[in-house]
Design a protein with these regions (language model features):
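N-terminal catalytic or cofactor-binding beta/alpha core of small enzyme domains
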Residues: 1-231
C-alpha cells in the first residue's frame, strides 16, 4: 500500500506533503518514546483543555476471557498521546492488562470510567483509536454505526482532513462499524463518537511519513472540530 495516494491530491497539496527531514525525525523519536512510556496503572487518564476524549483500549497484549490471545494494536497508545499533546484533548488508555477487553459489548470498568469522564468534563467528541491488520484494503476506516454516532458534518470534516494529507483509501463502516465503546458512548450520551481503524502499514516507524500524515490529518481535524471550546 502506498504512503500517499497522489490521485487525491491537487498540485498545491502535493507541494504541502514534503515534510522536513528534521521534523520527521523528531516525530519518529516522539512516537517511539510515547509508545515506550508506561505506568503501573490499569487505566491511564490525562485531563485536557478541550472537550475531546481520545481513547486507546488495545495497547497491550492480553488473554481474553474466552482464552484467546489478543495482540496489542501497535502505536495506538503513542498516537493518542501525541494527538493529546498537540490538541489539548483528554486521553484514556488501557495501560495494563486485566484480561478484560474494553471494547466488548458488556459494560465493564473501562467503559464506566469513560462515561464518568464524559459527564464530568462535558466531553463533546470521543475518538476510539484502533489498529487494523495490514491485509485490509484501506489506510483508515471510520466507524460511525452506519452514520448514527456522529453528525454528517463531523464525518465529512474528518474525511476532508484525511484527503488533504493524501490519506487514501478511506473506508466507512465496513467491516468495522464500531464496537462496544462506540456503542456504549452512543447509547448512554448525546455526544458524537467515532471508531477509527488505522491500517498496520500506517503504524510502522520504519516508514514514519505514513504515520506522520495520519497524525497530521487527525490533528487538523481535531483543531477544527465545530464544538471546540476551551474548558
Amino acid at each position: 500500500m502506498n504512503t500517499i495516494d497522489p490521485a487525491v491530491l491537487s498540485k498545491s497539496q502535493q507541494q504541502i506533503l514534503h515534510v522536513d527531514p528534521a521534523e520527521l525525525s523528531d516525530f519518529q523519536r516522539q512516537i517511539f518514546q510515547l509508545e515506550r512510556d508506561n505506568t503501573s496503572e490499569l487505566i491511564h487518564f490525562e485531563r485536557g483543555t478541550t472537550p475531546i476524549l481520545l481513547n486507546a483500549p488495545h495497547t497491550v497484549n492480553f488473554l481474553k476471557e474466552d482464552g484467546s490471545f489478543k495482540m496489542r494494536e501497535g502505536y495506538t497508545k503513542a498516537i493518542v498521546k501525541y494527538l493529546a499533546k498537540k490538541t489539548g484533548a483528554f486521553l484514556m488508555i488501557k495501560e495494563n492488562s486485566d484480561g478484560i477487553d474494553p471494547n466488548k459489548l458488556e459494560m465493564e470498568n473501562y467503559k464506566h470510567q469513560l462515561l464518568e469522564v464524559i459527564n464530568k468534563y462535558q466531553i463533546q467528541l470521543v475518538l476510539d483509536i484502533h489498529g487494523a491488520a495490514s491485509h485490509h484494503d484501506f489506510a483508515i476506516e471510520i466507524g460511525s454505526l452506519d452514520g448514527v454516532s456522529a453528525r454528517i458534518q463531523t464525518i465529512e470534516s474528518l474525511k476532508t482532513a484525511l484527503k488533504d494529507q493524501g490519506i487514501a483509501p478511506v473506508a466507512e463502516n465496513s467491516p468495522f462499524k464500531g464496537g462496544g465503546i462506540t456503542k456504549t458512548v452512543h447509547g448512554n450520551t448525546n455526544i458524537e463518537v467515532l471508531q477509527l481503524e488505522i491500517n498496520r502499514n500506517y503504524r510502522n516507524l520504519t516508514h514514519p511519513e505514513k504515520l506522520f500524515y495520519i497524525c497530521k490529518s487527525l490533528e487538523n481535524f481535531l483543531k477544527s472540530f465545530p464544538q471546540l471550546n476551551s474548558i
